[in-house]
Amino acid sequence: TFTQAKRIAWDYVKYYAGVIPGVSFNETELRVDFPNGGRLMLLSAENPDSLRGIYLDMCAFDEFGMQNPRVWGEVVRPALSDREGAAIFLGTPAGHNHFYDLLETAKSQIDEGSDQWYYKIVKASESKLVKDEELKAARAQMTPEQYEQEYECSFTAAIIGAYYGKLISDAEDNGRVTRVPYDPMYPVHTAWDLGINDSTAIWFA
């Protein structure tokens, strides 16, 4: 929301941009005007239609998985096209939602040789931004699923009814879940675990 943008990010924007000579800040619109004509704005994704009509050179989504997916597909993506702009997506996993789908798209595009995509998964245990003692304390006070999602970037932990979530996460971490070449001339067999109140799993062989 607009209030969250102001509370969480606005002070950082002013701190880092304030050292630029000639820069000005609009507190009402959460807008920064640079002396070269450039502009930076903090916007709310709460109402996608309120963003229509803007033009963008770059857009950064924070906690993309918590936002309405219409914002990207119907508003921001078209706004970037005529200026050949770019987008950055940041967030915390929350199951197999549109943030997960975007990550899978990035992986697929990179596998196909595209240089227009990049992704990075930063786990707390690897980044060392959080001390090991704090991670140990958090692990002791949270369920394994909560810890894996919030600290270790697990998209599987948050899926209700994912009985094999931990096993799948371990398989992914160990490189046992990957893409393999296949011959379209051979038949493919599938086994379906139909999800009623949770996700459907499909195995291919």
Name the predicted role of every residue range.
Residues 1-205:
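Phosphate/NTP-binding elements of NTP-utilizing enzymes
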